[in-house]
Structures are given as structure tokens and as C-alpha cells.
Amino acid sequence: PDTKCVCCQDGKQCPCAGQECCITGKCCKDGASVCCGTCSNAACKCTGGCKCEGGCVCTEGNCTC
């Protein structure tokens, strides 16, 4: 099973396929595994300080993490 990490600011858990997302503070996006981290897409906006890395699909007021 995927390692559960509390990476989001809002306290939501996200699967991270065994990667150390909580230790590094960065997010991994590997297939269906998504964690929170710095968003590399300027068009992505998330409230609450939660941002998604890579091809993030966050919108204002919503975070897929």
C-alpha cells in the first residue's frame, strides 16, 4: 500500500507511493500518486497554501491533493 503523508496545509492525506514527501516537504506525482508541494505551473491557483507540483489541476478554492 502507498505511504500516507499529511502534506497538505488543510490536513488532507495523499498517497505518495512510498516516497518521502513528508520528510522532504516536496511532492511527488507518480501516476495516481499525488502529494503536496510547490506548483511549477503559474496558471495553477490553490487557496490555503496548498499547491500541486507538475501538471497540477488545482483551481482557486480547490486542491486535488
UniProtKB/Swiss-Prot annotation:
The keyword Metal-binding applies. GO terms for molecular function: metal ion binding. It comes from the Eukaryota. The keyword Metal-binding applies. Keywords: Metal-binding, Metal-thiolate cluster. SUPFAM superfamilies: Metallothionein. Coiled coil: none annotated. Transmembrane segments: none annotated. Metallothioneins have a high content of cysteine residues that bind various heavy metals. Belongs to the metallothionein superfamily. Type 4 family. This is Metallothionein. It comes from Paracentrotus lividus. The lineage of its organism: Eukaryota, Metazoa, Echinodermata, Eleutherozoa, Echinozoa.
